[in-house]
């Protein structure tokens, strides 16, 4: 099919080339032979009057013109997919849909297992691909390459819809044999102790307590940096180091390890966990179904947490 002289099938080829950055892989993705894909590249170059890609080894390197075309083409194809091709009613019990979700190890351990267990009962053929924090998460959302982000709301952009899940607080943790934690933790002690700190993504973004400390002109003595909160407790065992992590995750590890939970000596801010999805998938029936489950399970967990907190204070 042509539109103003452009074979629209070429847009599918260009999208695959931008995603895969390899001629053979792109051809395989859209079920073309390699010669057919090479011909598509030649036609794209003629139509747009640009080289579009140069070769670096076996990798295709897009030109600025190709980079500029990538986002609108991806969004147009995604819109067609969701509004025309996939408008049939979504039946969870019969679906084999795969949901790609970026989330932290914290949310995987304390929350998302609930989602997986419930979906296994209601939609046994539905699959999940859980992905680690990415520095490009907003771009992945925009391209429709992930279905959801699940992490602190403050890291989310305003470009896509989102919903809050629950509030979380930060606590300090250390080995139960650490004698420095036998008395109330002071600011001076906290700052002088060796810390295990979680940072995220390839750029090692600082986490919430790090931002708080930097804003107040405070700098900890970080001895170990780990990728994710879940790696903090194992590194603390049999040491005099300290870590800072979400309360729910600390309680999870407290049951399994010699972990001691103490109040931070500083008023570390709480944070809001949220879920975000691509704007293009806002009316997608499968996305709506999954969002409903995520929000319901978040409400159930928040209610159980509040009830437990009330019992402790009675």
UniProtKB/Swiss-Prot annotation:
Keywords: Activator, DNA-binding, Nodulation, Repressor, Transcription, Transcription regulation. Residues 23-42 bind DNA. GO terms for molecular function: DNA binding; DNA-binding transcription factor activity. Residues 6-63 form the HTH lysR-type domain. Pfam families: HTH_1, LysR_substrate. Coiled coil: none annotated. The keyword Transcription regulation applies. CDD domains: PBP2_NodD. The keyword DNA-binding applies. NodD regulates the expression of the nodABCFE genes which encode other nodulation proteins. NodD is also a negative regulator of its own expression. Binds flavonoids as inducers. There are at least two nodD genes in B.sp strain NC92. Belongs to the LysR transcriptional regulatory family. PANTHER family: HTH-TYPE TRANSCRIPTIONAL REGULATOR LEUO, HTH-TYPE TRANSCRIPTIONAL REGULATOR LEUO-RELATED. This is Nodulation protein D 1.
